[in-house]
Amino acid sequence: MSSQQHKFKRPDVSVRDKKLDTLNVQLKKIDTEIGLIRKQIDQHQVNDTTQQERKKLQDKNKEIIKIQADLKTRRSNIHDSIKQLDAQIKRKNNQIEEKLGKKAKFSSTAEAKQRINEIEESIASGDLSLVQEKLLVKEMQSLNKLIKDLVNIEPIRKSVDADKAKINQLKEELNGLNPKDVSNQFEENQQKLNDIHSKTQGVYDKRQTLFNKRAALYKKRDELYSQIRQIRADFDNEFKSFRAKLDKERLKREEEQRLSKLLEQKDVDMGKLQEKLTHAKIPAFTYEIGAIENSLLVLDPTYVKPKKNILPDLSSNALETKPARKVVADDLVLVTPKKDDFVNVAPSKSKKYKKKNQQKNTENEQPASIFNKVDGKFTLEPTLIATLAELDVTVPINSDDVKITVEQLKKKHEELLSKQEEQTKQNIESVEKEIEKLNLDYSNKEQQVKKELEEKRLKEQEESEKDKEN
C-alpha cells in the first residue's frame, strides 16, 4: 500500500483545512454583522396604534375593491339581460310584420272593426255602384282576415310590452348601481393611508436601508458557503480519484497475478501435451514392428530385417543386420524360467518401456542368440517367449510351430505396417485436438478471470456509492 501511495499522491487534508479555516473566519464575521443589523431593524418599528390604523384602512380598501368588483359584475349582467331582451323584442316584431305584412293600415282589431262598420253602412245606403260595392266587399274580407291575424299576434304584442317594461326596470336598477360613490370611498380611504405612509416614511426608509445591507451580507455569506462546498467537493473528488487509482492498481495487480498463475499452469499442461505430441509423431506400432522383426530374425534364418534410416547422418552400413543364427527346432523344449531370473508377467506396454526396448533393439541390430542348450537341447530364451506372448502369437514348442509362428509374425507385421501411417495421423490429430482444447479452455479461464475482476470492481464501486449516500 505504501508503494502505491508513493506512486499516486494522496490529497493533502491540511491544505483543504487551511482554506476552510480562512473562509470560516469570514463567515463568523458576516454572521456577527447580520446579528447587529437584525437588532437595528427591530429598533426601527412603527408604533402599534399607527400599525392598527393602517391595517384597518387596508382592510377597508379590500372590502371596497370587493364591492367594486361585485358592482361591475352586476352591471355587466344587467347589460347582458337588456341586450337579450332587445333581441327578443326585435325577433317578436319581425314575427308580427310577417303575419300582418308591412302594408297593413290597421294595427288593432278596434280600428279594423270600425272600418268594417263603415263599409257595411256604405253598402246598406245603396248609393254605391256595383264595382264600388265589390271593392268594399273585398276590403271587408281582407279586414276580417286582418282581425283574425291581429287576434293571433296579440300574445306576441303583450310579450313585447312585457319585455319593454322589464328593460325599463333593468335600466332603473342599473342607474341605482352607481360605482361613483364606492370610488369616492376608496379614494378617501387611500388618502388616509397615504398620510400615514408619509408620516412613517422615514422609519420605512431606514428599515429598507437595513434590509438592503442584510441582503448584501446574505449574498456574500451564500458565496462563502458555495466556496466551502466547492473546496470540499474538489477534495472529495480528488480523494475519490486517488482511491479509484489505488483500487484500479490493486485489481490490475490481482489480475496480473491470477493470469500469471494461469499462464504457468498452462505452460506446464502444454509442455505435457507437447511431449505427448512428440511421442505421437513417432510412427505408430514402432515397438510392435521392431519386436516382430527381431523375433523373425531369431525364428526365420532367411529373414532380412528392413533397413531403417532413423538418423540421416548414419551410413546405411551401420544399419545392416548380422546373419541370424539358424534355429534347430527338432528337439526344442519349453523351459520354465526360474523366479529369480524371470517373472511370468506380460511386459508393460508403457511408452517408457517401449522406448527403452526400441532403443535397445535399434542398438543391437543383430541380437545375441536367444537359444541355449539345456541337456543337449535348444531352448527359447524367456525374453522371446514374453515377446511372442505380448504379440499374441503362438509360442513354438516344435519345428511345425515355428513355421506357424513365423507366418503369424509376418502377417501381423504387414497389418501393422498398413495401419501405421493412418494410426500415426490419428495419434497426432488426437493430441492436436487436446492442445486446441487446452488453448480454448485457458482462453475461457482468462476471460473468466477478467470478468470476475470486472464484477468485483463494479460491486466495490456500488458499495462505495451507497456508503457515500448514507
Curated annotation (Swiss-Prot):
Biased composition (Basic residues): 349-358
GO biological process: cellular response to glucose starvation; intracellular mRNA localization; meiotic cell cycle; protein insertion into ER membrane; protein O-linked mannosylation; regulation of mitotic nuclear division
Coiled-coil residue windows: 17-178, 237-281, 398-469
GO cellular component labels: cytoplasm; endoplasmic reticulum; nuclear outer membrane-endoplasmic reticulum membrane network; ribonucleoprotein complex
InterPro entries: Bfr1
Residue list for modification Phosphothreonine: T336
GO molecular function: mRNA binding; RNA binding
Organism superkingdom: Eukaryota
Keywords: Coiled coil, Phosphoprotein
Region (Disordered): 346-368, 447-470
Keyword Phosphoprotein: yes
Residues modified to Phosphoserine: S260, S369
Phosphoprotein is among the record's keywords: yes
Chain's role: Implicated in secretion, nuclear segregation and in maintenance of cell size.
PANTHER family per the UniProt record, alphabetical: LEBERCILIN DOMAIN-CONTAINING PROTEIN, NUCLEAR SEGREGATION PROTEIN BFR1
Other comments on record: Present with 33400 molecules/cell in log phase SD medium.
Domain text: Three regions of the protein are predicted to form a coiled-coil. It may adopt a rod-shaped rather than a globular configuration.
Listed name of the protein: Nuclear segregation protein BFR1
Gene (name only): BFR1
